[in-house]
A protein has these predicted regions:
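Soluble catalytic domains of enzymes that build or remodel membrane lipids, polysaccharides, and related
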Residues: 16-233
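Single conserved hydrophobic/aromatic residue that forms the stacking wall/gate
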Residues: 1-12
Length: 233
């Protein structure tokens, strides 16, 4: 059942910064190349049914030289804007710069070390291809106190080290361990491996990912698509 997905829904209602409800879908670690385009097709079909305002992608969208830009065609059926940050695997692919540029042809905006603002929300993207120190510096520079700040970053390593103005951080990378015994090794490296973590009004969500890497199998974990609703108090 490696490519079976579940949907997880999360509602945040405690912020006075929000002036209207916004719905996001969050996916990560699709690993096109290792996984077939048909898997992405099914993901996009499910996202369409979720009725979201934005699709956010937390890195590792593709991972091998067998990936071709036309594998992204399922994204063209989505009417919502799509925002993407790089993970570690994109940089392992030959000609990755050109392939990243081709994402724009499929309505995907690359948000590495950039911010877009809409309504009362800052959507901040942080590239994986830099040191943690640089990631912390960029995150703190892009968030603002008066806006609700959603930060997308591939690895969940810096959450406790960044500004309290980061209201919600979305990450992937860990695959929740994917299969035994890798789950033990992942827990040794990352404090926050899967799920929702809270510190006052600050939150981190670490996804189990929407695909697999290496063995096309999962034991004790599932692929997922996450729907996040942020609402005013």
């Amino acid at each position: 059942h490696a490519l079976v997905r579940r949907q997880r829904q999360m509602c945040i209602r405690d912020s006075k910064k929000i002036d209207r409800r916004l719905n996001f879908a969050f996916i990560s670690d699709v690993h096109l190349g290792s996984n077939p385009t048909s898997h992405l097709e099914k993901i996009c079909n499910e996202v369409m049914l979720l009725d979201v305002d934005y699709l956010l992608i937390g890195g590792d969208l593709f991972d091998t030289n067998s990936f071709q830009a036309h594998d992204l065609e399922p994204f063209l059926k989505l009417e919502c804007p799509i925002y993407f940050v790089t993970g570690n695997h994109e940089y392992y692919v030959d000609g990755y710069k050109e392939k990243l540029e081709q994402l724009r042809r499929y309505n995907i905006s690359i948000l590495d070390n950039e911010v877009v603002s809409f309504s009362s929300i800052n959507l901040v993207g942080v590239s994986d291809n830099q040191s943690e120190e640089k990631q912390i510096q960029i995150t703190n520079a892009l968030v603002t106190e008066e806006m609700y700040n959603v930060v997308i970053i591939h690895k969940p390593s810096i959450w406790e080290k960044v500004s309290q103005n980061v209201d919600l951080m979305l990450s992937g990378h860990t695959h929740k361990g994917q299969i035994f015994p890798f789950n033990f090794f992942v827990r040794l490296k990352f404090k926050n491996v899967y799920g929702l973590f809270e510190d006052g009004s600050n939150r981190l969500y670490v996804s189990s990912g929407s695909g697999t890497w290496g063995p096309r199998m999962r034991l004790g974990t599932q692929n997922e698509i996450v729907k996040i609703s942020i609402q005013p108090i």
